[in-house]
UniProtKB/Swiss-Prot annotation:
Catalytic activity entry: tRNA(Leu) + L-leucine + ATP = L-leucyl-tRNA(Leu) + AMP + diphosphate
Protein encoded by which gene: leuS
Protein name as annotated: Leucine--tRNA ligase
Family recorded in the similarity comment: Belongs to the class-I aminoacyl-tRNA synthetase family.
Cited NCBIfam families: leuS_bact
Keyword Acetylation: no
Locus of motif 'HIGH' region: 42-52
Signal peptide: none
Amino acid sequence: MQDTYQPAQIEAAIQQQWANEERFKAVVNPQKEKFYCLSMFPYPSGKLHMGHVRNYTIGDVISRYQRMLGKNVLQPMGWDAFGMPAENAAMKNQVAPAQWTYQNIAEMKKQLQSLGFAIDWSREITTCRPDYYRWEQWLFTRLYQKGVIYRKLGAVNWDPVDQTVLANEQVIDGRGWRSGAIVEKREIPMYYFRITDYAEELLNDLEQLDGWPERVKMMQRNWIGKSRGMTIRFPIEPESQKGLSAENAQFLQIYTTRPDTIFGVTFLAVAAEHPLALAAAEDNPALRQFMTECKTGSVAEADLATMPKKGMATGRFVTHPLTGKRLPVWVGNYVLSGYGDAAVMGVPAHDERDFHFAHQYGLPIVQVIQTEKDLPAFNADSWQEWYGDKEEMHVIASDDCNGLNYDQAFEKLSEKLAALNLGEPKTQYRLRDWGISRQRYWGCPIPIIHHDDGEALADTLPVVLPEDKIPDGGGSVLAQSPDYYECRFQGKAARRETDTMDTFVESSWYQFRYMSPHYQKGMLDPEEVAYWQDVDQYIGGIEHAILHLLYARFFTKLLRDEGLVHTDEPFKKLLTQGMVLAGTWYREQEHGSKIWFNPADVQVKTDDKGRIIGGVLLSDGKPVQYGGMEKMSKSKNNGVDPQALIKTYGADTARLYTMFTAPPEASLEWSESGVEGAYRFLRRLWAYCYEFRHSIAKPSEVVPLNEKHQNIRREIHEQLRAARFDYERNQFNTVVSAGMKLFNCLNEIEPDYDALRREGVRILLLILSPIVPHITETLWQALDFSGVISDQALPEVDETALKQDNMTLVVQINGKRRGEISVATDAAQQNIIDCALADERFAPYLAGLTVQKTIYVPKKLVNIVAK
């Protein structure tokens, strides 16, 4: 054992030992309880960031702790390797995405391994390899045959210059990110999953997920968006039916969650793609031009919500189903063609969007809801929040519905509209079917062949993606590659589908493929699936709360219905780790933009309380402005390189710092002094163990503990109990605190009590081993403890050590603390009170007073009330 802590040397040696022994290889063992711990797998960008380090350290600590509880732990790792960033990098570097991706994977794997994670690398998966995505294609064929996957027209962002489809994030201010051209909305054939068929189950099963943060469950509830409303049909006037097909000519149908406001409808709005709008535009050039404008811009809902609302009258009219009034139909750029009926009723008095739209175009505003709260009266010139409420409201100006609240009006209107066959109650979901077609190269090929008579499933799987293409940004690479798409079907020329699947598909089922990554007889090995079942603990960022987690839940139900898994939900518990923050520094340019500098390049100035008051750039000595703590990012240039950190301090310091500085769910504010503090603690631990090892030539006699050392042993086991409790709660910062307190206890043990020192060191190393596995494994072996530390059980608390012969109680007189007394732990209440009254130290406070009563709070205090 070296006399100084050399992290690089010991970490390399321990990692090699683990690898040689396949220490963390997971094998099915029906005799042991399983624990499957999974952190969201990374995109292989080529470089780890501190968010990765924190995420995977949390998962590793949980995995190692569960291993100490005697469970058979599976902690795998893989690569979410398809996606647009690889295509962008390929264009920039003129290299095939496959080459770029595989190089990055090799580099990132080394970085992950340098952190000492207890990963079973034999189960590594890479989603861009055919041995993974072939089973995705196989499942596609099954679901396509059953109608769970279908094809229809879907709206996309189209760049008319680059002649390519753009993802929502590639549309910036309505323009293509590369060409700068105004983006158009286009409809093209796409493949969809019928996720809406599972909407109710996805919603209801959230109640089973007791181990998920309530915030995440609420986000999913809102995304699924179950609503109780009503379908209402507005008869189209005869002269407005021109150009409409028979099925579209009779009614304009809408869905609303506020049927109680139906008497306030003053117009209807339809999407530019609605049949009525298309018919009206046939002989209306101005309307046709406006509808063309509506088809420009992003199809992303977030963009649609913030864009200016515009409209144009169609010249067509419908009849109000209850009043018979004539209502104009407008085309509105805010109405979504792919959602509901692509038509909405306009109630300006009680919908903020409709209110501003009506003011913009001079449409009537009719109040039909009155508040029962003490609020300002309705004013058609100024929007107030209560106009849109439905709680503590009643209906007015609505015939025989007057005076009714929302629920009463809903029932009344249901009856009235049903009697006229013009409406009925309906439950609707915000969730829409999942369009998986992507007009991109670097993704899983869709196994479809198009031929003269329609389309068919590919008869040979996998349909292998060529890995030698280099995209140029000018449209789909596969659509420009005859060597890929040209094929034959039943002896005739045919064309292979050139769209690829949404990369969320790969990450929706990877948790199950880890169970049998090399299985060739099917998508999943039944024996492995029966044992591992589901993920016991999942770890990842809150940014994945909706799409990834919802799609993974959906896929689990699909796989269950195919008989491939036997669980309804993929992840029993979910931990969403907080962000890693760091200080930001910048200089503002003349034109208003900012140049950001890395904190490592800044000399920070602080006041006498340690607060930042400024800084200067080390390279030129000139001032830079402090921008506060923000999430580490490339854009703010405030990242910390994990590899540089590991090189300087070691992986255990990085792990200790990230676990100690903040609870897992909270944001972590980066501090160089904090990193140095973690490193100092490990050096002190090493030095203590070195001194201990060399101070004992042979096992010493067990010396009976005096009162001081009984108290030290009690404190050791108190901290062990605290650490065990906090491990169960994933509060690793307080686990480290308990370890540090325990370490302080060790320093109080006198030389003659080596048996107690050895017990304390053993407990300390075991407590810290999930967090700092390299140093604890090394010290464990150096101190000749049996076996290896990663195979040890978590130590049990010795309850006898926690028992105290005496306890200390506070003594109060008339509620004021006057001192303490020491009494036997098992003393009777009256004896305790008598002891307090007899103590001469309290006599001056009772002089001239008569004791009225005494109050005893068990194990805490005695209060003497005297007058």
